[in-house]
Regions:
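Short, glycine/charged-enriched hinge/interface segments at domain edges or termini
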Residues: 49-209
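Short acidic active-site motifs
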Residues: 219-223
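Short, low-complexity N-terminal leaders and the immediately following helix N-cap/first helix
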Residues: 1-56, 107, 125
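Short beta->alpha junction loops
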Residues: 209-217
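Short, intrinsically disordered, charge-balanced linker/junction segments flanking boundaries
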Residues: 227-228
Length: 228
């Protein structure tokens, strides 16, 4: 009987939803990155962008780079740029001197600690997370918080997901009574309808409680017909 029922199942038409509305749905196509993340070399620490070859300094601070507000100039020898976590690393810089190991007086920067261990220190390289064209999510995946975040970072504002099936729940039996009704020894409370609806809660489907149907073929046929 189960095999016959499953053989009648078919995929519902796909739909396009905003990413915020697609939570809990299932992807119908792969998510392929439209952008690279990070899109540029970024600082992993607060501090100063420098050229490692200039160690141990001193340097002259010539500007500032913050997230969303980058330094557009070129860093040259013995120069430094104040930088914050997530900011673009200026052209010409190859290391970050963290602020805990630096001293600054006006525009003069000096080394007060060990300094970066080598060129490339404290820099998140372009494409560390993923590159444009990478397949990040596979069709058939259920969209939870993590995949939703990945899709957004990959450049998606909408996603193609499966349609929402309608699930009708029927409680059948002459012995069933609605929850809370007084029960004698010949009857029991009908718990399955509400229990099954609770189990389906959170899945991408619409549930309809069709109530209790007596053990009568005509009534059952009518109930099933009303679900179509």
């Amino acid at each position: 009987a189960q095999a016959r029922l499953l053989a009648l199942a078919f995929p519902l038409p796909a739909t396009t939803l905003p990413v915020a509305a697609s939570v809990g749905h299932y992807l119908v196509e792969d998510v392929v990155a439209k952008r690279t993340q990070p899109a540029a070399d970024l600082s992993a620490m607060d501090g100063y962008a420098i050229q490692f070859a200039d160690m141990p300094g001193p340097w002259r601070v010539i500007g500032e780079s913050a997230a969303g507000r980058q330094f557009d100039g070129q860093l040259s020898t013995s120069r430094a740029v104040r930088i914050f976590t997530g900011a673009h690393v200026p052209a010409g810089a190859d290391s970050i001197l963290i602020q805990e190991e630096a001293g600054r007086h006006s525009d003069t920067l000096t080394l007060t600690g060990a300094g970066p261990p080598g060129a490339g220190a404290h820099i998140r390289r372009k494409g560390t997370d993923f590159s444009e064209g990478d397949r990040l999510l596979e069709a058939g995946m259920r969209l939870t918080a993590g995949p939703i975040g990945a899709a957004i970072m990959a450049g998606f504002g909408e996603l193609r997901v499966g349609g929402r099936p309608k699930v009708s729940i029927i409680g059948s039996g002459d012995e069933l009574l609605s929850p809370g009704e007084p029960c004698d020894a010949a009857h029991i409370p009908s718990s399955n309808n509400i229990m099954l609806a609770a189990m389906l809660d959170g899945l991408p489907c619409d549930t309809v409680d069709q109530g209790i149907v007596a053990d009568n073929l005509d009534d059952l046929e009518n109930a099933f017909s009303s679900c179509a």
